[in-house]
Amino acid sequence: MSNKDIRVVVGMSGGVDSSVTAHVLKEQGYDVIGIFMKNWDDTDENGVCTATEDYNDVIEVCNQIGIPYYAVNFEKEYWDKVFTYFLDEYKKGRTPNPDVMCNKEIKFKAFLDHAMNLGADYVATGHYARIHRHEDGHVEMLRGVDNNKDQTYFLNQLSQQQLSKVMFPIGDIEKSEVRRIAEEQGLVTAKKKDSTGICFIGEKNFKTFLSQYLPAQPGDMITLDGKKMGKHSGLMYYTIGQRHGLGIGGDGDPWFVVGKNLKDNVLYVEQGFHHDALYSDYLIASDYSFVNPEDNDLDQGFECTAKFRYRQKDTKVFVKRENDHALRVTFAEPVRAITPGQAVVFYQGDVCLGGATIDDVFKNEGQLNFVV
C-alpha cells in the first residue's frame, strides 16, 4: 500500500509542532486531514476565545499545506474525564497531572475513535516521542530525540492498542529544526510561542482559577515538631517541595512544604532545601499501565529507571507488584520531593515502558507526611 492510500488524521492545536507534523506527512504523500479539538470553553474576561484564534491558525496552515480540516468539540468528554479528575485530586490534597489524563482519555481515545470513524488508518500529533514498530506488529514508544522536549512522560498511560494507531512525525527531530521547517514553508505558526501551563487554565492565575471551583480553607502552617510558622491559604494551593508563596521571613535557609494533613487542615513546613523530611526511599503507585505488559515480570520485579516529574533526570529503581492494584517502586538512592498525584514513568534506555500514579511516599522507617 502506498502512502497516498493511507489516511492520517492530525490533531492540530494551532501551534507550530502540529503544523509541521501535518506538513511532514503531506510531503511524505499521505492522505492527510487536520482536526482541531475544542476541549474547553476558554472565553476570557474580554469575551475573546483563544480557541477561535487557534482554530483560525489551523485553517490558515491547512490551506497553506493543501489539506482538508474540521473542528470537533470534546468539551463534555474533557469535563467528565479530565477536569472532574483534576478537581477530585486537589480535594484529596494531591497534585494531579491533567496532561497525562488528557492524552489517555481525549487525544488518544475520544479523538482516536473520532478519527477512525472518518476512515483514518492512523492519527498523528505533534508530540516529541517516537514509535518503533516491530515486524510482528507490536510497538514500543521511545523518547523524542530532542531530550529537552521529550514528552513520553505525559504519554505514559497509552496502551499497545492506542500506540499501534499513532504516528509522531516530529519525534526524531529537534525543536529548532521544527521551527526552521515552519519558517522555510512560510507557515503562519512558525514564530508562535509554545503554550505553557495546564491547557484549560492557559495564562490565568492558578489560585484564582482553582478558587472558582473549590472553596479555599485557610489553616495553620507548622513545623513537624509543632511550631506555628503562619497561615496557609488552602492546602490545594501547595505542592511538596514548594518554596515560593509561604510568606515565612527571617534569616537562614529558605522554607519548603514537606507535607499536608487534610484532617486537621495543616500545612507542614521545614527549613532547608535538603531537609530530611523531603527525601524518601520508595513509593506506592496505582493505575499502572505498561505498553507491553508481558515484557515486565511484576511478581519477580525488575530494574529500570524512572522519572517522578517532567524534565527530571532518570533515577535507578526496582519495580515490583505490591498488590492487585498497586506497585512498589524502590529507589537506588533517596529522592527529593516526590509528589502524590503525579506520574512515575518507567524507562529502559530510550524505551518508555509505561507509568503509574504516585499514591504514598515512604522512608524505610515509615510513611512520610506528604499527604495524610
UniProtKB/Swiss-Prot annotation:
A Pfam family reported for this protein in Swiss-Prot or TrEMBL: tRNA_Me_trans
CDD domains found in the cross-reference section: MnmA_TRMU-like (cd01998)
Segments of this protein annotated with the region Interaction with tRNA: 149-151, 309-310
Site residues, Interaction with tRNA: H127, Q342
Primary subcellular site in the record, as a coarse category: cytoplasm
Annotated stretches, region: Interaction with target base in tRNA: 97-99
GO cellular component: cytoplasm
Cysteine-cysteine disulfides: C102-C199
The entry's keywords: ATP-binding, Cytoplasm, Disulfide bond, Nucleotide-binding, RNA-binding, Transferase, tRNA processing, tRNA-binding
HAMAP family noted in UniProt: tRNA_thiouridyl_MnmA (MF_00144)
Family to which this protein belongs: Belongs to the MnmA/TRMU family.
Protein name per the record: tRNA-specific 2-thiouridylase MnmA
Origin species: Staphylococcus aureus (strain Mu3 / ATCC 700698)
